[in-house]
UniProtKB/Swiss-Prot annotation:
Its main location: secreted. The gene is Serpina6. This is Corticosteroid-binding globulin. The record marks C249 as: Conserved cysteine within steroid binding domain. SMART domains: SERPIN. Belongs to the serpin family. The lineage of its organism: Eukaryota, Metazoa, Chordata, Craniata, Vertebrata. GO terms for cellular component: extracellular space.
Amino acid sequence: MLLTLYACLLWLSTSGLWTSQAKDPDSDLSTRSRHRNLAPNNVDFAFALYKHLVASAPGKDVFLSPVSISTALAMLSLGASGYTREQLLQGLGFNLTETPEAEIHQDFQHLHSLLKGSNITSEMTMGNALFLDRSLELLESFSTGSKHYYGLEALAADFQDWAGASRQINEYIKNKTQGKIVDLFLEQDSSAMLILINYIFFKGTWTHSFPPESTREENFYVNETATVKVPMMFQSRAMKYLNDSLLPCQLVQLEYTGNETAFFILPVKGEMDTVIAGLSRDTIQRWSKSLIPSQVDLYVPKVSISGAYDLGSILGDMGIVDLLSHPTHFSGITQNALPKMSKVVHKAVLQFDEKGMEAAAPTTRGRSLHAAPKPVTVHFNRPFIVMVFDHFTWSSLFLGKIVNLT
């Protein structure tokens, strides 16, 4: 039997960060602090996982939602037994002698609720669904806990008829994501008897739009020998910018109209690995304090990217070694004995476009004739890094390494 975990992360169309004032009107400090208890562990896990994925795919695109993966693994721990449960939670950075397990799940419950409901200016759909064969039955303890803390929805499927089961799952995901993802599973034979799907659909709005009339086709330099054509968006305005003195890169910070903030990081040519190695929670906090308003001519590709990963071996390298080994380690999920779990898969899709809440004044590529400070030009026409954070919950929503835009 196969346990397949799918995180479907769709549509990024795009608000400071941890030092910013949250836009949520909730002023109850005890409530506000609960979800931020998770932030240090979640962000540390995010960068550890991101670096493992990058190392496993040199020269390729990487894109994931760390907070989504953390949430799914924490939920799985409800069905794990003994040492496996400790491995899962410790792999996420939790010290169970300092933080009671019940508190961890309560914090994730609050975080999940905030991410789903706090941003009225964006479309966001988040959820968890467990498809299990009709011969299996969930244990009441796992069913109750996973639904209460993580909103898990359990559905029966006939996995003896994989073509029919895959169509059922595809239709469910299509409906939940408003048609933004289709054909998640192909109609091919599978030994799966239980499939966990963690999905998130997000369509945000930039605070400052990119003028559509300024978008033009340009070269994107994949490497020294490969070039592809991409539509390149453009805007010229004051925005937060940094030419980092510690890591060899430039970066800009762009905001959504809600609680989200995007960092676009452009490494010096040949220094992508150096910059990625230097990414950490401390780096993000330093950047948040160091970015200063500057006049910038900004060029960003209008593209869609996607990634699919079998996380099993990577999570094993990170110390969660029992996640895929023996069925007894997850004896708390179903009343029936589970065969060996063999796959944990994460899938992500990202799209950038020009849409924003505030229309930008028409901008012209090239210099104006009247006297003005010369803008800094930041041209994302070669491999770059993108990160999206929710600055109210301090969550790492998305991390990406963009190399090839074909």
